Amino acid sequence: MRAGRGTLGVCLASVKQSQGGDLDKLACGLKRRSEKRNPSPSDVPSWTDQPVADTHGKSRAMAAASSEMKRDQSKASLILHSGFKALQYLKESMGRNSTPAASLSMAVVLSSAPSEEHGAGVSGGIGDTLGSDWPAREPRTTDSCGQYLKGEAWVSGWQGHPKVREVGFLRGEPLSAVPKGLGTRSELSYCSELCQLPYTYPYYEALPEDKTRCVSLDHLSPVFSEETVEDEKTLSSTSDGLQIVMGLLALQSSRLTSL
């Protein structure tokens, strides 16, 4: 600094040289610039608007980097603004009554897919519990004697056996028609056939081999009661719901006695 070789000395020397050595003129220009917010370029020397280079010469690089960052920020803000506008438009379109059909259909598809899978699982569980021959189910395998193989539930495939299907409902009425193939539905409801099962299973092996003979309940005795006229009248006078409950109870008892 004393030798005039510092940064301040270099600046003063350059200013003095540009202004012809008149420092008072430079002070007057700076004063007018401070008084006026928008001074004319002629009043202020051009060197005041230029960044002063440091000892390492990094000012121009920093200025370029700063301008590049500003441009990137402006682009990012523009993208965010566009995305926000698109999101607002989507919310408004979903809130209006005139919602696009594509959005509704997509929402319905996404919401109905798990429901269909859940419903299929529930129906499959009901079919396995009742042992009914539901659609798309294959008949269970049996051995040569007609008995189900070890590990197979005997309830699961009883509906396809001809002897069981020939037995009439609680009053001994024969079936009006018997399907010819396995895996088909009977004309009777599943509840009616379920009530027949407790009566027929204890005599499953004793039934004759003639598949055309129609077996009546007069030749079979119920599992849970004696063969009397009073019991037959009681069964005939009860409602369908009570018959189903009694049939389910008999089904459990016959399954336990057969073990």
Swiss-Prot record:
It is found in: Nucleus; Cytoplasm; Cytoplasmic vesicle, Secretory vesicle, Acrosome. GO terms for cellular component: acrosomal vesicle; cytoplasm; nucleus. The keyword Transport does not apply. It comes from the Eukaryota. Residues 29-66 are annotated as: Disordered. GO terms for molecular function: STAT family protein binding. Keywords: Cytoplasm, Cytoplasmic vesicle, Nucleus. Disulfide bonds: none annotated. GO terms for biological process: intracellular signal transduction; negative regulation of transcription by RNA polymerase II. Residues 39-49 have a biased composition (Polar residues). Signal peptide: none annotated. Pfam families: FAM220 (PF15487). Promotes dephosphorylation of transcriptional activator STAT3 by interacting with both STAT3 and protein phosphatase PTPN2. This promotes interaction of PTPN2 with STAT3 and mediates STAT3 dephosphorylation by PTPN2, leading to negative regulation of STAT3 transcriptional activator activity. May be required for spermiogenesis or sperm function. Interacts with transcriptional activator STAT3; the interaction occurs in both the nucleus and the cytoplasm, is enhanced by IL6 and promotes STAT3 dephosphorylation, leading to negative regulation of STAT3 transcriptional activator activity. Can interact with both unphosphorylated and phosphorylated STAT3 but interacts preferentially with phosphorylated STAT3 in the nucleus. Interacts with protein phosphatase PTPN2/TC45; this promotes interaction of PTPN2 with STAT3, leading to dephosphorylation of STAT3 by PTPN2. This is Protein FAM220A. It comes from Rattus norvegicus (Rat).
